[in-house]
Amino acid sequence: FYGASTIMRFGKNMNPTTLSALAAFPSQLEAHYAAIPPAFRHWTPPSWEGVPSEAFTAIEQLCHVRDIEIEGYHVRFRRTLQESHPTLASIDSEPLAAERNYGAADAAKVLADFRLARVQTMEIISSLSDAQLPRTAVFEGYGPLTMRSLIHYLCSHDQQHLAGLQWLAGKIDASTVAQ
């Protein structure tokens, strides 16, 4: 997705491991989704106890990641850069999933839209100056943070959803065991 030289150009005062993870995530997300058997992409387990992400089916995980990238992090980045210490909203994901009928989404389109959004995210990050990384905001549920913090939280969100897809894969496999 992005080569090492591009990541280094993005680097400035950002951790290159974080930047590499952000750049690699679209391919990882697609691979994790592809590993879910097609018959289980809309499947829900009998219990969501222990899920490391929101309680979403595999297709719903994709839609959520796309929407949080665009309507969550793009907006948060813009506001943190343009406003003085803004309060950044947390998005209530479950009503959004129901309203947008995530379960009926076309995975290929969702993944393509997400890839484009992540390119835009990496462009935003690559354009940041050293003076912009410490800009501050308050994020609902997280408290005070910096622009740099937001970038780390986005990377954490990515990893949370890879873990959610792995958790679903484990539950799918466990569902084949007789009770």
Question: Which functions belong to the PLM regions below?
Answer:
Residues 1-59, 67-179:
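Aromatic-glycine hotspot motif
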